[in-house]
C-alpha cells in the first residue's frame, strides 16, 4: 500500500453520510467536502497530522497568493501527479527494503499485538477510556500507517528504554480548522518562505526519513542537523510489521480491507538528540534558568481544561520574568495570511504518567475576529478564569487543612480538589463561549460579566463543598475563616478594588 496513491483515508461527507475510504488524489483534486471518520478522536488527529505532514513535503505553496488559491481551488490531476512523483517510493507501507515508518530486520522474541500501537487501548489505564472490544485486533493498511505515525510523533514511547518523538512523549498539537478536510490540511501547510524561515539551515541537514537512512545506534544528533522531512516523519523506535492476514473488516475503522495487520516486532534502540527541533505544529515554552535559555514543547500535564492554555497556543510572549512562549508556526501563518478572520483551533494530545496514557485530549476552540490583534484581551480572560479558580481553591484548602498555628481544626477532606474539578467543568461552558463571541475591541463589559459569573460560581461551589460539614461544632470557626479567605481573594480580583458581595 502506498499512501500517495492508494485508498487509505477514512472519511464521510461533511454533512453526513456513509464512511468511505479515499486516496490522496481524491482529497486534493475534488470539491467534495469530507471530514475524517474514525472511532477515536486521537486517531482522527493523528490522521490529520499525517495528511498535513505529507502535504508539507509534496505541496507547499510558493507564496501567499498560491496558498489562498489552493485553499479555494482543488488541484488538477496532472498537477497532483507532478507533485507526488518525486516522493512515491518513500510512502510504501510494505516496501521490500524501506517500508514506511519501519526498520527492516528487527529482532524480537515475541510478536507485539497491534493494540500496543493504539495509545490507551491496552495497559493498566485503559479503563480510563471507552474503547470498542478488539479495536486493535487487525488493522487495515491506512489505520496501521496512522497508528505508526501517531506512536512515533504524538504519543509516549513504549517505555522501558524506548524513545519518544522529537517533541517529547505527549506534545500538544495545534491545527487551524477549515470548512472541510481538504482546506484544513492545506491551511496547515507552511508556505515555502515560512518553511525556509522555520528551517534556515535546510541545505546542511540530513533530510531523508529514518526508514531510508536509519538513525545509528548510540548516535548523538544535533537537532539542527535534522531536516524538515526527516523531522516531520521521525521514527524513534525500531518497529517492523509482521506479514498481514487476508481480507476482512478492519477492527479500527470498520471498513473491509484486502490486507490487515495483526502484530509487529519491536526492539530497544538508543540514541540522543541534542537541542529542540522546531516542530511547526506545537507551541513552545521558553524559560531562562541561571542565564541559560531552555525550550520545551507544551504538554498536557494536568487535567485542567484546554482554555487554561489558550494564551500559550495563540499569543506569542517575549521572555518576561524568565518565562515566554512561541505559538505553533501553522497558527502564526494563519494570523498573518488571514488577519481579519476568526479562528477555529484544533488542540489535542495526551496526558500521561511515563508510558501510561491517563487521558486523551481533543478540543476545538473558537476565537472571534480580532484575536490576532488582541492577545492582551485573551491573556486577561485566561488570567481572570485562573484567578477565580485559585481563590476558590485557597479558601477550601484553608477549610480542609485548618490553621495549625491558631489551633483551628480542618475538615481533613480534600474538598478543594473536588471543587477545582467542578470549577473547571463549569468554566468550560463560560470561557470558550466568551472567546468565541467577544468583540475584542470592546471587551471590558464582557470581561466584567465573566467576573460576575465566576464570582457566583465560586460562591456556589464553596457553599456546596462545605455544606456537609457546616454544623460540625469543631469546624464552625474554621468555616468562618475559610469563608473570609474566599471573600478576601474575591475582593482582590475585582478591578480597582471594586466591592464584593462578601
Describe each PLM feature range.
Residues 1-123, 150-502:
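Extended alpha-helical scaffolding segments
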Residues 128-130:
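Beta-strand elements of modular eukaryotic interaction domains
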Residues 132-135, 244-245:
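Flanking scaffold residues of small Cys/His-coordinated metal-binding clusters
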Residues 140, 149-150:
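Acidic (Asp/Glu-rich), glycine- and aromatic
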Residues 140-143, 253:
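Short Cys/His-rich metal-coordination motifs, predominantly Zn2+-binding knuckles/fingers
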